[in-house]
């Protein structure tokens, strides 16, 4: 059937996105110039709301395309300038290098990470202990590595194990699609598969929350952490210590929540690994171990040594984070024999789309700065007493981060806090406390929905999610106990423990305040 050019354009525009979504984006593109001609301020806020909409609808269409169109139009109609965007990108180069090189570097260490999570899954029989181990392992890894990569590894383990059992249970071997359950005629096998799905769902959610618990602690745990650390002129250890009054109690309560939901089988947790599934997986792992060559074993040892280098280099701030990631790429690929250009190129596939999206974030940030969009909000917050400022920043960040991407939210608020410092509206001490409130408020409540955490969104959009019946609603439900506990404990710590604990660490000379002019000159 022949279609018109109009129909062809409608099909091509934003690909497989729903028709209503395409119409909405076109309406935004038409309305924005009209509103801008009447009021640049309201047009700017409209753009921010539209951009948050594209982030919230990430499952309908990846936000790079619709968000990029909105940002491109904003430049054309004069809401910001290419020079301003270039300045924001240049100022955040370290973050871009983190996403490009660190994520790619960890890609080449996947064998080691797969080995670790596989041994955890098969050697720990208690589901409670296993859940705690997955949560703790994900938290530790996310404190030094990108959370997206950690979740990608856990997904790889889960897909592999699901495929092994599904092929054996269906009796069709590798020719049967993992989504095809038609050959599972035995009710016992079907029941075991359903239980296995629930088991994998709970482990993946524990690991996902673990990435948030660990990722909030360090400057490399999440991209926005690095932006906040750069503005405050904090290095790895100082960032870790300044966050500790909030992140350590939240971490402990998060681990306690993990125990309770498993112990009492709440919110979809508590499913055990069926015995027949465990036996099949153990047999497969035994065969894999026996067939592992000395070359394979040496690769694992090399990756472990490079992991030690990575942690040490980050802890002692031996170089910029992105450059440390590049060193990981060079060391692992050269010592493990990965020299094919196409194999190396695959390592960058996960990070580059998000890197491009982050650049679009910076375009929207440029609009916010040029149009002074957050000035009324910041003035409202700054008119409050200093202790209430921390609470309001935490709550505003948390609310937005639960429905929008936390990198975008964190970037916007730390820019506004930095502007308040430079104008003399707040003191250096208050700015540093606000930076902690912004970082924790951005990271902790964002586990509420997949929109806030890139790792959660990656899990939801992965090929594994439909196999284990992990829907958007189920993900929100399973994250609910963690959301409530982490958000409330974080808020209480910001109100009651942050300032006295920071003062105590200063008295112990664990923290030192840099000269105000140094902080001002080192920001973005």
Swiss-Prot record:
Q: What Gene Ontology cellular component terms go with this record?
A: plasma membrane
Provide the leader sequence positions.
none
Q: Which NCBIfam families match?
A: NhaB (TIGR00774), PRK09547.1 (NF007093)
Q: Which reaction does it catalyse?
A: 2 Na(+)(in) + 3 H(+)(out) = 2 Na(+)(out) + 3 H(+)(in)
Q: How does it sit in the membrane?
A: Multi-pass membrane protein
Segments passing through the bilayer = 23-43, 44-64, 97-117, 120-140, 144-164, 203-223, 236-256, 304-324, 354-374, 392-412, 448-468, 476-496
Q: Which family does it belong to?
A: Belongs to the NhaB Na(+)/H(+) (TC 2.A.34) antiporter family.
Q: Which GO terms describe its molecular function?
A: sodium:proton antiporter activity
Question: Which species is listed as the source?
Answer: Edwardsiella ictaluri (strain 93-146)
On the tree of life, the source organism's domain of life is Bacteria
| InterPro entries registered for this protein in UniProt | Na+/H+_antiporter_NhaB
Instruction: Give the record's keywords alphabetically.
Output: Antiport, Cell inner membrane, Cell membrane, Ion transport, Membrane, Sodium, Sodium transport, Transmembrane, Transmembrane helix, Transport
Purpose: Na(+)/H(+) antiporter that extrudes sodium in exchange for external protons.
A Pfam family name for this chain?
NhaB
The answer on whether this UniProt entry bears the keyword Iron-sulfur reads no
Where in the cell does this protein reside? Answer: Cell inner membrane
Q: What is this protein called?
A: Na(+)/H(+) antiporter NhaB
């Amino acid at each position: 059937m022949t279609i018109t050019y109009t129909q062809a354009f409608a099909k091509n525009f934003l690909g497989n996105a729903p028709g209503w979504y395409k119409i909405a984006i076109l309406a935004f593109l038409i309305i924005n110039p009209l509103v801008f001609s009447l009021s640049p301020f309201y047009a700017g806020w409209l753009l921010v709301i539209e951009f948050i909409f594209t982030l919230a609808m990430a499952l309908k269409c990846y936000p790079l395309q619709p968000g990029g169109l909105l940002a491109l139009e904003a430049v054309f109609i004069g809401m910001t300038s290419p020079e301003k965007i270039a300045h924001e990108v240049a100022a955040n180069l370290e973050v871009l290098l983190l996403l490009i090189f660190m994520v790619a570097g960890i890609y080449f260490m996947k064998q080691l990470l797969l080995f670790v999570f596989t041994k955890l899954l098969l050697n720990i029989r208690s589901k409670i202990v296993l859940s705690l181990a997955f949560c703790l392992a994900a938290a530790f890894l996310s404190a030094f590595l990108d959370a997206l990569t950690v979740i990608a590894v856990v997904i790889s383990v889960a897909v592999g194990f699901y495929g092994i059992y599904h092929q054996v249970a269906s009796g069709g071997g590798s020719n049967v699609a993992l989504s095809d359950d038609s050959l599972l005629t035995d009710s016992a096998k079907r029941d075991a598969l359903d239980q296995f799905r629930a088991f994998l769902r709970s482990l993946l959610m524990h690991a996902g929350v673990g990435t948030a618990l660990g990722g909030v602690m360090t400057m490399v745990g999440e991209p926005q952490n690095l932006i906040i650390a750069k503005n405050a002129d904090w290095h790895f250890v100082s960032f870790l210590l300044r966050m500790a009054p909030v992140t350590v109690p939240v971490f402990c309560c998060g681990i306690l929540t993990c125990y309770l939901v498993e112990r009492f089988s709440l919110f979809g947790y508590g499913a055990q690994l069926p015995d027949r599934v465990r036996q099949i997986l153990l047999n497969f792992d035994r065969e894999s171990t026996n067939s592992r060559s000395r070359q394979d074993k040496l690769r694992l040892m090399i990756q472990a040594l490079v992991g030690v280098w990575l942690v040490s280099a980050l802890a002692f701030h031996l170089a910029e984070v992105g450059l440390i990631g590049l060193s990981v790429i060079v060391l692992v690929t050269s010592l493990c024999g990965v020299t094919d250009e196409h194999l190396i190129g695959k390592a960058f596939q996960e990070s580059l789309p998000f890197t491009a999206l982050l650049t679009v974030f910076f375009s929207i940030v440029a609009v916010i700065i040029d149009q002074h969009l957050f000035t009324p909000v910041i003035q409202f917050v700054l008119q409050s007493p200093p202790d209430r400022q921390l609470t309001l920043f935490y709550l505003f960040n948390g609310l937005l981060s639960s429905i929008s991407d936390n990198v975008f939210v964190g970037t916007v608020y730390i820019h506004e806090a930095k502007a308040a410092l430079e104008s003399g509206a707040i003191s250096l001490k208050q700015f540093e406390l606000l930076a902690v409130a912004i970082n924790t408020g951005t990271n902790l409540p964002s586990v509420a929905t997949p929109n806030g955490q890139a790792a959660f969104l990656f899990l939801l959009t992965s090929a594994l999610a439909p196999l284990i019946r992990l829907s958007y609603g189920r993900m929100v439900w399973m994250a609910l106990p963690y959301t409530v506990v982490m958000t409330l404990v974080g808020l209480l710590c910001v109100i009651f423990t942050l300032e006295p604990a920071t003062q105590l660490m200063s008295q112990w000379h664990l923290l030192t305040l840099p000269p105000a002019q140094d902080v001002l000159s080192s920001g973005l």
